[in-house]
């Protein structure tokens, strides 16, 4: 049996649907969770879906994924631009890591164009709104089945 795909969302994503919907869309994080669970289920895989505004909690979940996940999808949000500690945690993984962003950071402010997480990511999906998560699930599935 394939281990679940862990999906982690960083700070402020609990406000998805109400915070800057012109950038991040109108779907809530619960909507995203439902879509990810359905997409994964269609491939015979389950999802562990979590969100935290706290860097240390995200790092603990990355450590947990070392043993319990087949792949990790992470939307680090603002921590992608600032957290070397999160990068270091991700570098301990031997499973596929897919970095996921709702918007396209390369088309936004200069400070958003670099993410530390990308240095540990197998691949990046960005700019497709809530569908970025589903596309990341598909990418993860493809990598664990390869």
From Swiss-Prot:
Q: Which Pfam families does the record cross-reference, listed alphabetically?
A: DHquinase_II
What catalytic reaction does the record list? 3-dehydroquinate = 3-dehydroshikimate + H2O
Where does the entry annotate site (Transition state stabilizer)?
19
Q: Which domain of life is it from?
A: Bacteria
- For whether the record's keyword set contains Amino-acid biosynthesis, the answer is yes
Q: Give me the residues that bind substrate, please.
A: 75, 81, 88, 102-103, 112
**Gene3D superfamilies reported for this sequence:** Dehydroquinase, class II
Per UniProt, the keywords (alphabetical) are: Amino-acid biosynthesis, Aromatic amino acid biosynthesis, Lyase
Top-level class of the enzyme under EC nomenclature: lyase
According to its UniProt record, which residues of this chain constitute the active site? Answer: 24, 101
Show the GO MF annotations. Answer: 3-dehydroquinate dehydratase activity
Q: Which cysteines share a disulfide bond?
A: none
Q: Which CDD domains match?
A: DHQase_II (cd00466)
Q: How does it assemble?
A: Homododecamer.
Function statement: Catalyzes a trans-dehydration via an enolate intermediate.
So what family is this one in?
Answer: Belongs to the type-II 3-dehydroquinase family.
Protein's recorded name: 3-dehydroquinate dehydratase
Designated gene of the protein: aroQ
